[in-house]
Curated annotation (Swiss-Prot):
It is an enzyme of class 6 (ligase). The N-terminal region contains the highly conserved SGGXDS motif, predicted to be a P-loop motif involved in ATP binding. Belongs to the tRNA(Ile)-lysidine synthase family. GO terms for cellular component: cytoplasm. This is tRNA(Ile)-lysidine synthase. GO terms for molecular function: ATP binding; tRNA(Ile)-lysidine synthase activity. Its EC number is 6.3.4.19. It comes from Xanthomonas axonopodis pv. citri (strain 306). InterPro entries: Lysidine-tRNA-synth_C, Rossmann-like_a/b/a_fold, TilS/TtcA_N, tRNA_Ile_lys_synt, tRNA_Ile_lys_synt_N, tRNA_Ile_lys_synt_subst-bd. Keywords: ATP-binding, Cytoplasm, Ligase, Nucleotide-binding, tRNA processing. ATP binds at residues 28-33. One of its GO terms (biological process) is tRNA modification. It is found in: Cytoplasm. The gene is tilS.
Length: 440
């Protein structure tokens, strides 16, 4: 997009002449976001496209109310609508106060963002250099060293950092030239926080020796982003070749890849499923499963409400469903979908108004059930029939069993008795069991 220079100062931050869409500014009241607010408010095109601001009130400082009031006055003066959101920061989350506040803030951003809106953050080049150093000290690979992206999908819109290429000194000069007023949060100078320590102690020392240190670190972040993008293209091209028809990872196909590529394919597979990033110790644990050729292993690695399970020489990614209460049961006539305790659903598909002659009993598997299949004169153990299906064991455990009196009629829609099958065919109907993941 074509850029225009901000008025008054040469070298001040640049904004695209044409807004990418409606903008929601994350406005803390600090110097950085105050400059971005002033720049955006000075652009008629941005106002016309839709411009508003959001201030997150963390309630962690005695002056938090005064900061919110300052933000309101500033936005009123610039005629920019402001939304103030109060959040509860979990002090006992185990993440630390800084990380917990960031999580609460991002949750507020995600909730406030309207579909198609661009969430503008006021990060600059010095922030990028700090992030690069922090990631390097955590032994990050190219994805981590890419630090902050200029833009990326976020919630129902796009996260946007329009000033990422510009130095903090440029922003400060702009703020002084326009006589802006801003908030100085004392927590931003507390050296107990890693980022503040880098900002106040490490980077000034580096810049004494290497005056272009900040520029060089930010450039390294960009080069890492370029490398990461190329690697990701390769990963996504290779990924279909190691997947089964059901989307599981084929261990035999993975073994044909190098160790380094396998690690990347594992992460790409998890990312493609919109699951939380796979941690390094998770990659190591799954690498052991790839190297283990035993056919009967049933290993599992879990993190952040996600699991990778091994079964039949494949790795499956799934989100564990809620357990069924042992005594749960329901009467179901098929007229409406039946919501199951784990979020799954049972449906009777057919003509409008179709229902069973008598309500059926639906409950979880108890063990020992037997069922008479179509065109069979004797019953089979349900357990043995389920084992013969290409259905992972954790899915079998969640199958609802339908009963009519003492007779088992079905296990989900996977196994249907002769009696129920005949009724379904006579009524041009079908039984459908959808897991929580399918239902969503």
């Amino acid at each position: 997009m074509r850029c225009e220079v901000a008025p008054v100062l040469t070298g001040t931050p640049l904004l695209p002449a044409t807004p990418p869409g409606p903008v929601l500014l994350a406005y803390s009241g600090g110097m950085d976001s105050s400059v971005l607010l002033h720049l955006l408010a000075a652009r008629p095109r941005y106002r016309h496209a839709g411009l508003r601001a959001l201030h997150v009130h963390h309630g962690l400082h005695a002056d938090a109310d005064a900061w919110a009031a300052h933000c309101q006055r500033t936005c009123d003066a610039l005629q920019v609508p402001l939304q103030i959101v109060r959040v509860q920061v979990a002090r006992d989350s185990g993440l630390g106060l800084e990380a917990a506040a960031r999580n609460a803030r991002h949750a507020a951003f995600a909730q406030a963002l309207i579909a198609g809106e661009w969430l503008a953050l006021a990060h600059h080049r010095d922030d990028q250099a700090e992030t690069f150093l922090l990631r390097a000290l955590r032994a990050s690979g190219p994805e981590g060293l890419a630090a902050m992206r200029p833009q990326r999908p976020f919630a129902s819109g796009t996260l946007w950092r329009p000033m990422l290429a510009h130095a903090r000194a440029d922003l400060l000069a702009y703020a002084h030239a326009h006589r802006l007023r801003w908030i100085d949060d004392p927590s931003n100078t507390d050296p107990r926080h890693d980022r503040n320590f880098l900002r106040s102690q490490v980077l000034p020392l580096l810049q004494q020796r290497w005056p272009q240190a900040t520029d060089a670190l930010a450039r390294s972040a960009q080069l890492s982003a370029d490398a990461s993008a190329l690697l990701l293209q390769q990963d996504m091209a290779l990924l279909p070749g190691v997947l089964t028809a059901s989307g599981a990872l084929d261990l035999q196909a993975l073994r044909a890849q190098s160790v380094e590529r396998r690690a990347r394919l594992l992460r790409a597979w998890v990312s493609a499923a919109h699951a939380p990033p796979l941690p390094a110790h998770g990659v190591a644990a799954l690498e052991q499963e790839i190297d283990n050729h035993a056919a009967d292993r049933h290993a599992c690695f879990a993190w952040q409400q996600v699991e990778v399970r091994r079964w039949r020489q494949c790795l499956f990614l799934h989100r564990p469903a809620a357990a069924w209460p042992s005594d749960w049961h329901a009467q179901w006539d098929g007229a409406a979908p039946l919501q199951l305790p784990d979020g799954a659903q049972l449906r009777l598909l057919g003509a409008p108004g179709l229902r069973f002659a008598q309500p059926l009993l639906v409950r979880a598997r108890q063990g020992g059930e037997r069922i008479v299949l179509p065109q069979r004169g004797h019953s089979h153990q349900l357990k043995h029939l389920l084992q013969a299906l290409d259905l992972p064991p954790w899915e079998r455990e969640r199958l609802p069993v339908l009963w009519e009196g003492a007779q088992v009629l079905a296990a989900g829609d996977c196994i249907i008795s002769g009696t129920l099958d005949a009724w379904l065919q006579a009524n041009a109907a079908a039984l459908q069991w959808r897991t929580a993941a399918d239902a969503n």
